[in-house]
Amino acid sequence: MSKPLRILYAVGPEDVIEAYNYWIKGLDAPSQVSVTFSSQFYEVCKTLDAQGYVIAQSNKFEKVQDDRFIIERRPVPWSPGALYHLRQIYCGLSLLASALRFRANVVVADSGTTYWFVLSLFSWLGITVIPSLHCMLWCKYLPLRLVDKLNLSLSRNLFASDCKAILVASQDIAKQISQLTCGKHQPILEFFSSYRRSDFANIPEPSPPSPMRVLFAGRVEQNKGVFDLLEIAKGFATEGKDIIFDICGEGSALEPLRQAAIQAGVERSFICHGYCSKPQMRSMFAQCHVVIVPTRTDFIEGFNRVVCESILSGRPVVTSAVCPALSYVADAVVEVPPNDVQAYGDALVKLLCDRQLYEQKRLACQVVQEQFYDPTKSWGAALKSILLT
């Protein structure tokens, strides 16, 4: 582009100020196992001598500014029911107003920051748009609701013509874009989450499984399958199986899940740890034998970084095709049907009892993990390549 780049980046609930404060010191934020997307954005702006304006969703307002960046965390009000749709449109219009005040000539917008069709307004006003999709456009196992059909219909033009290129976290997302646009869309660039090899160096091989430890990491929500895990744990306790579940992460279901485990009398084998920092997560990956990702069909999973982190830690994964990451690491995964609680439990027992299968899956982790260390496949590298064309 001939004009100096002025890029607005709209991101979800990432702590972009924490990431910035560590980035300027040449460090990664300790709150995330992967390299944050905002720190990759800062690096791209620095490399291209661009001005950057980062707006993240938050529960409180914060702002920092220097010669190159304006970085804000903006509160997003909770809006139930139909008000949610109005809020999403309002958030998009608010981003548009900020982009105009900043005199942005490029806007990069993540999933969830507004409805996709609102971004066409930016394009009509001469601002280059780069949508960054971390989630599926719709739940691939469920029928579309009327409101979803309307939203997608309105969003078709953005992907077909009103953007410069499209960043996607998986091929499953790319396929949905192609389906939505009947194959007539702007260039699609796939990216992986980025990891430092040093963060996974010297993680020991799994100890003998006595007890077997199963790790869940991520948002603690019903649609992430956490209550399915509790049902499995209750069944294992009744059968006397020596299997412990470690639940790591925050979410609206954390306290209800913890209380349900106590009421069921399985709190010693179903441990809710809450939020865990990067060093704590390293310890959790090191002590576990298997990582489980039981996302249910009513969640629009885009990839699931925990699958990457499990593979990089040398731990097999149990998951279903709801998780698009499966196709990238299939040799290191035991696949089960979506939402099948019994099948998840059976898969864990099989890995516990069949040492040959477990070793086969564990060794496969070493084969498939290299793709996640490739810097040319990072979000930042994909964004930079778009900006340079």
Language model feature labels by segment:
Residues 258-276:
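Nucleotide-activated donor-binding/catalytic signature segment of Leloir-type glycosyltransferases, i.e.
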Residues 286-300, 315:
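Acidic donor-binding loop of glycosyltransferase active sites
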Residues 331-342, 350-355:
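Conserved acidic donor-binding segment of nucleotide-sugar-dependent glycosyltransferases
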Residues 312, 316-319:
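Short hydrophobic beta-strand element within catalytic cores of glycosyltransferases
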Residues 36, 212, 216-235, 252-255, ...:
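A conserved mid-protein helix/loop that constitutes part of the nucleotide-sugar donor-binding site
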Residues 156-202, 272, 302:
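Donor nucleotide-sugar binding/catalytic pocket of nucleotide-sugar-dependent glycosyltransferases
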Residues 38-43, 93-100, 146-166:
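Membrane-proximal helix-turn-helix segments that form the acceptor-binding/catalytic region
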Residues 109-115, 133:
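Short His-centered aromatic/hydrophobic patch
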